[in-house]
């Protein structure tokens, strides 16, 4: 599609990147043939933002090496601000929201600066079939285009780039028919990019980042703590019902499974970046991700009140994670 056609459809507005939702192609990490199609709104969002800035997001997945379980949940993994700064010259900092959010977004776009914004998924059409016009949920987006006159916004969310219009525009920015006073101010971050650092590349800093995450991982195998929590929660899941199950599974199985699958991508990257042998960990990470999916299916039966036995898949998840981490540590060093 030509730039003129994009402008005709989306309007002129303010934008940082020339993107069109119709022709946008997500990063290969977000192909549909994955075991876990999504991680969480923040990780998936940053993969696409980095991809659209012309950078490879894979080095920023180093957080998988320090991810763990505190006995209550698997880490809500995030691409770390310090890694964004080290690898890409990108500084991410919380904004003081003292004006209507739309004003901050527009001012940022006018200055060539993106922001992350917490919004209500109820107004995001890309979530059709889940939260869109059905359920109020917190999620994070990065607006890239705003046309205030025509009420159009182009935005990054989860695994892609989308647009919304009309009543959804009003809803996202709490505009119509008038602002609701009880709506809390969202968490907003400014994304400042040092183009010189981004364009120059990161040299061997990606390996330094990998070693730093390995060095600060908790002792022991975090999957053992995860397994204990899952087993302890079986009675809760059996009585709480399907809706509660989805929330429970997100914080334990989806976060772990997606972390393991991203780790497979990451170690394959490391293997070609001066850590030969790291790719040998990828099959173990993918088996761990598949194991988490199998446990999720069994726990879905528990959510319908059935008895489940999880010993075998949980043991295999733990073994695969341990084997993978040993291989990575040996290849990368600390």
Residue ranges and their predicted role:
Residues 204-334:
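Charged low-complexity "KEKE/polyampholyte" interaction tracts
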Residues 66, 73-74, 104-109, 178-183, ...:
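Short, highly charged low-complexity linear segments
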Residues 148-252:
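Noncatalytic regulatory segments and standalone regulatory/sensor domains
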Residues 1-2:
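Type-3 copper protein
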Residues 33-39, 44-69, 98-150, 155:
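Active-site-adjacent substructure of cysteine-protease-like catalytic cores
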Residues 6-99:
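A structured, charge-rich N-terminal accessory region that forms the first stable segment of a protein
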Residues 110-125, 168-181, 205-210, 328-333:
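A short, terminal or domain-edge coil/loop segment
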Residues 49, 94, 105, 117-119, ...:
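Generic structural hydrophobic/aromatic packing signal, biased to beta-strands
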């Amino acid at each position: 599609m030509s730039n003129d056609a994009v402008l005709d459809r989306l309007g002129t507005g303010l934008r940082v990147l020339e993107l069109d939702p119709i022709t946008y192609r997500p990063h290969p990490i977000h192909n549909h043939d994955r075991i876990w199609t999504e991680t969480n709104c923040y990780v998936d969002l940053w993969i696409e933002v980095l991809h659209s800035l012309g950078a490879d997001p894979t080095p920023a997945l180093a957080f998988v090496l320090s991810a763990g379980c505190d006995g209550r949940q698997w880490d809500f993994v995030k691409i770390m601000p310090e890694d964004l700064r080290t690898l890409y010259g990108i500084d991410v900092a919380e904004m003081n929201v003292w004006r209507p959010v739309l004003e901050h977004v527009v001012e940022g776009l006018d200055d060539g600066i993106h922001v992350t914004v917490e919004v209500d998924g109820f107004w995001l059409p890309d979530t059709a079939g889940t939260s869109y016009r059905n359920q109020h949920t917190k999620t994070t987006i990065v607006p890239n285009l705003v046309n205030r006159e025509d009420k159009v916004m182009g935005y990054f969310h989860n695994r892609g780039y989308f647009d919304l219009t009309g009543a959804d525009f009003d809803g996202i920015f709490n505009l119509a028919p008038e602002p609701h006073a009880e709506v809390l101010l969202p968490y907003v971050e400014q994304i400042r990019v040092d183009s010189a650092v981004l364009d120059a590349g990161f040299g061997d800093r990606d390996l330094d980042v990998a070693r730093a995450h390995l060095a600060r991982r908790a002792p022991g195998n975090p999957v053992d703590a995860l397994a204990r929590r899952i087993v302890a929660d079986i009675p809760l899941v059996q009585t709480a019902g399907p809706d509660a199950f989805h929330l429970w599974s997100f914080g334990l199985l989806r976060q772990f499974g997606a972390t393991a699958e991203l780790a497979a991508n990451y170690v394959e990257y490391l293997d070609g970046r001066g850590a030969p042998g790291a790719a040998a960990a990828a099959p173990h990470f993918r088996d761990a991700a598949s194991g988490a999916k199998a446990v999720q299916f069994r726990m879905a039966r528990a959510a319908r009140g059935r008895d489940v036995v999880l010993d075998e898949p949980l043991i295999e998840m733990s073994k695969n994670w341990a084997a993978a981490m040993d291989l990575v540590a040996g290849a990368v060093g600390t």
